[in-house]
Amino acid sequence: MRRSHLLATVACATLACAPLAANAQFAPAGSGGSPTSSVPGPGNGSGNSFEPTENTPAAKSRFSGPSPYAPQAPGVNAANLPDIGSMDPNDVPQMAPQQSASPASGDWAAYGHDDSQMRYSPLSEITPQNADQLKVAFVYHTGSYPRPGQTNKWAAETTPIKVGDGLYMCSAQNDIMKLDPATGKEIWRHNINEKYEAIPYTAACKGVTYFTSSQVPEGQPCHNRILEGTLDMRLIAVDAATGNLCEGFGNGGQVNLMQGLGESVPGFVSMTTPPPVVNGVVVVNHEVLDGQRRWAPSGVIRGYDAESGKFLWAWDVNRPNDHSQPTGNNHYSRGTPNSWAAMTGDNALGLVYVPTGNSASDYYSALRSPEENKVSSAVVALDVKTGSPRWVFQTVHKDVWDYDIGSQATLMDMPGQDGQPVPALIMPTKRGQTFVLDRRDGKPILPVEERPAPSPGVIPGDPRSPTQPWSTGMPALRVPDLKETDMWGMSPIDQLFCRIKFRRANYTGEFTPPSVDKPWIEYPGYNGGSDWGSVSYDPQSGILIANWNITPMYDQLVTRKKADELGLMPIDDPNYKPGGGGAEGNGAMDGTPYGIVVTPFWDQYTGMMCNRPPYGMITAIDMEHGQKVLWQHPLGTARANGPWGLPTGLPWEIGTPNNGGSVVTAGGVVFIAAATDNQIRAIDEHTGKVVWSAVLPGGGQANPMTYEANGHQYVAIMAGGHHFMMTPVSDQLVVYALPDHKG
Amino acid sequence: MPNTYGSRTLTEWLTLVLGVVIILVGLFFVIAGADLAMLGGSVYYVICGIPLVAGGVFMLMGRTLGAFLYLGALAYTWVWSLWEVGFSPVDLLPRDFGPTLLGILVALTIPVLRRMETRRTLRGTV
């Protein structure tokens, strides 16, 4: 220990201090004096004065983005929309009863089925006994896939919704369509002509939102609307019956969400999740491309009137008391934590639960404000009347591991001490820690312990938190910390290679501090634990279904000089060439002393993970009787995976990495694809037995859904594939039903 | 019929190739295994590498001892891997599957090596 600590200190002194000094212009205003060799630590800053002002000299590194005060690049306002006006949140009209509040039994009215986002359907035609007879009923092609000359950045991740006579969905590039739920016939399609350049890390559209207006009478256009947030940052409202833009919403049916975000380029900021509507307020979040620069566009959360599209409020972390839109050359404070997961609305409490990510430059935290440190990698309950947080529950303190929350919160009732149900919220995390909170005040219902974590770490001026929260009342969706003997391979040769790789890295468990002198192992990595697939919950049986990953990462901070040599530059650098791909988060972190290199913890010569299988699991937890694991097994076979990317064809349930969630039904069947074996499965909810599986035309990295049409149950999965999961991309929505109900 | 003067049969050539493969694996074990041991990791590889290199060299020399050195290293590998991970098939796979396959091939060379040894002895006495 002593020796390695000494080495780390020496390495930091020689490698790190020069760039630290070069970035001293970001010292808090008024701190005065000559540049110092350390950056301000937590609590040393004075809030938003960290952000460069208009007069701050340009950064001196070889690659860097323009001043945050530079104008937005052409195409950032994709539809050249005029600015949207504001209105008083108190003037938002009373919301009409929504389909998502109490869907018809055969409908799937919201991304996670209904307002609770339980991913539970009361349908029961398909059972563990008959599921093995499921056949393809129809296939629908969205038409969105990489064309020749385009880098594969596709992963549609789409879950359709079903309301009444329509199956509503979006393509990976945000075209909106309504299908006949029984036949898959296209009833209408609204093309939004999104440009390839607008695709950020991934072309994804997780879904659309169904909204019923209280202002437009029934029977008139746009009484029922489909709302969508797009990759190119538009909020779009179309008529559910015709697909025509709702003229009364925003500017001719669209709102430019880049308004107020300041300098940006296409692909830097994007929306991939369906925006929830809470008491008439449509709330939007957006992802900000990881790893680019400290002063990336803001992660601001905004509320708009779902009827008119007018701006209501903003929650801008570093302007906590200012909920208005910036005017003139001003912008929302930059580099603040973004939220890219699906949010959950709560009409009864007037809250929206925002799963937050990290401040920009995920792996270096010394330039974050105290306000940011309070709300990053947290669940933030925003009051939809004001845009102010009512409570915050943080799942990682001072996150430098990209443990941002990708999952959507699920609402359910927990039995209270006096027998009264407590309104609860289940928040799965990439850490595999699942937090169960009282949604009235954010207090844990199941015990949460603050446990010691490695601190202060090795990066000067950027100490780690001495403790981190652990949800000790819930089974952890992770395996124990890695050991050398967990290294795997085809033979002792690659196993030896991985053992050396393991020993050459810093590793002191889940919160191993980032290092620049040598790599560090990050487990669970940014792929989870539980990622955007979230969990499903059966309120009848009290069973929670969670799928999760065991995919460690191998990361290293690099000095600015090394980052320049590697050609790491922010997306808004004039030299930036789009195309990239690869692991998420590799980046320049321009504006900080370091860049970041992120790789899977794998044998780069065989493409096999270094750790032993399984790499993906599925777990059923009994929430009503002491949160015990009912069953747990690896998810995904080796059929489409193997060394050098070759499919082995083996039916061995090795447990593959998985992305995408599950559905649980009253029939006692869990439907899930997610695994990289490109199969969809039906699993007996009570035993965990796989009762049916079918091979998809592409990777099933999406949340499935189920609905009823013409009196019969259907199961839909977008087989869109995933570029980083290396599964085949397709544009096919595949819908299954029992025989004799083919479309 | 065993040939008498120098030219080798196919099985003898294959035995020599196997010897070269075992030397290469053994060298990797010794060099990378020493690295691992110095990093604080398992010493199995560097220890196992020595009989592997020696076994490969003896096989190239046409000595039956080479095959037995390999089989001895294989026995050590099984004992070590069972000690390290127990009877877990997933974990035994990388540790023992390849070496055992190679061990079967090595066992098949024993008659060939014996023949080469006998021939050398005969040549020596003529």
Swiss-Prot record, chain B:
As its record notes, the protein acts as a catalyst of: glycerol + A = dihydroxyacetone + AH2
CC annotations in GO: plasma membrane
Q: Could you cite one Gene Ontology molecular function of this protein? A: glycerol dehydrogenase (acceptor) activity
Tell me the keywords, alphabetical order.
Cell membrane, Membrane, Oxidoreductase, Transmembrane, Transmembrane helix
Principal location: membrane
User: What is the protein's membrane topology class?
Assistant: Multi-pass membrane protein
Record flagged with keyword Transmembrane helix:
yes
Q: Where are the transmembrane segments?
A: 13-33, 41-61, 67-87, 92-112
Its EC number is: 1.1.99.22
Give the EC class as a word.
oxidoreductase
Instruction: List locations, semicolon-separated.
Output: Cell membrane
Described function: Catalyzes the oxidation of glycerol to glycerone. Also acts, more slowly, on a number of other polyols including D-sorbitol, D-arabinitol, D-mannitol, meso-erythritol, adonitol and propylene glycol.
Query: What is the name listed in the Swiss-Prot or TrEMBL entry for this protein?
Result: Glycerol dehydrogenase small subunit
